[in-house]
Amino acid sequence: MLVLTRTNGQAIKIGNEGEITVTVLEVRGNQVRMGIDAPKHIAVHREEIYQRIQEEKPKAPPILEEVE
């Protein structure tokens, strides 16, 4: 994991073309407000929402082995 230190107003760029920007908007106590600018085709979710989406995805049926 890459760990970066940023202060209010500073940003990081993600992707070969820098197409995703994460900007620190505010630090208050133990909370950080971040702004994320990403192309529309890239989904951005909080972790707990992402986990819920993954849990709700339909499960693939098991593959049955062919018997001769």
From Swiss-Prot:
It comes from Coxiella burnetii (strain RSA 493 / Nine Mile phase I). Its main location: cytoplasm. HAMAP family: CsrA. Homodimer; the beta-strands of each monomer intercalate to form a hydrophobic core, while the alpha-helices form wings that extend away from the core. It is found in: Cytoplasm. One of its GO terms (biological process) is mRNA catabolic process. Belongs to the CsrA/RsmA family. NCBIfam families: csrA, PRK01712.1. Keywords: Activator, Cytoplasm, Repressor, RNA-binding, Translation regulation. InterPro entries: CsrA (IPR003751), CsrA_sf (IPR036107). A key translational regulator that binds mRNA to regulate translation initiation and/or mRNA stability. Mediates global changes in gene expression, shifting from rapid growth to stress survival by linking envelope stress, the stringent response and the catabolite repression systems. Usually binds in the 5'-UTR; binding at or near the Shine-Dalgarno sequence prevents ribosome-binding, repressing translation, binding elsewhere in the 5'-UTR can activate translation and/or stabilize the mRNA. Its function is antagonized by small RNA(s). GO terms for cellular component: cytosol. This is Translational regulator CsrA 1. GO terms for molecular function: mRNA 5'-UTR binding.
